[in-house]
Amino acid sequence: KGRPAPVSVWCSAASTGEEPYSIAITLIEALGDSAARSASILATDLDTQVLAKAEAGIYTYDQVKHLSPERLKRFFLKGTGLQAGRVKVRPELRAMIRFEQLNLTDADYGIAKPFDAIFCRNVMIYFDKPTQGQVLSRFEPLVKPGGLLFAGHSENFTYVTQAFRLRGQTVYELTRDAAQGMRPRVAQAPAAAAMPSPVRARAAGAESAYGDRG
């Protein structure tokens, strides 16, 4: 709360979608239902196969067992027939998120507007220090003044960059000096990567197999 609307978030390692959907749920619960209309989440990953699963938004009960019954009913549809034992995110939750393929080691991400927060958790541990520094330098113009960078518990960027200062155990804030040195990006956002058609077909075919939870 306290950030001017509309709120924008980048989940830079979306995997199969649990994190971006959790962020969307948190925004709705923190800001109210209006967040579903104004907030936006960019969810990216290098792997288009996991992105296809994320875009489908279908999970087993075991994958969502940590959610309360109230959250399950509010944000998910219950599978029936061949989809029994599964849940699917509701369309209004899915509409908050844009899924795209992106490689964090690319020189230019093609993202034009900065975010209120970037989630990059448990990814940097696979990069050496020079690569970590390069990725963090690309994050600088993509974080709004006072914006946050969320890292994993095993990641520490204190000795990698001076642009972000540690604010909490795994939370970094863009420093004032870095924010004042920001330059507008003119690159256009790339078109969303095409997802594997079999996954899209299966998701479309299962659309009618989900309904409100009883």
Predicted regions span which residues?
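A short glycine-rich, Lys/Arg-flanked "PGG" loop and its adjoining helix->strand segment in the class I
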Residues: 133-145
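Intrinsically disordered or compositionally simple regulatory linkers and C-terminal tails
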Residues: 173-213
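Short, well-ordered amphipathic alpha-helices
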Residues: 20-31, 55
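Conserved beta-strand signature within the Rossmann-like core of class I S-adenosyl-L-methionine
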Residues: 145-153
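A short N-terminal interaction module
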Residues: 1-2, 7, 116-117
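Short hydrophobic/aromatic beta-strand or adjacent loop that forms the aromatic wall/cage
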Residues: 167-171
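Extended basic-aromatic, gly/pro-enriched interface segments that bind polyanionic ligands
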Residues: 12, 33-119, 123-131, 157
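Conserved class I S-adenosyl-L-methionine
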Residues: 4-23, 39-42
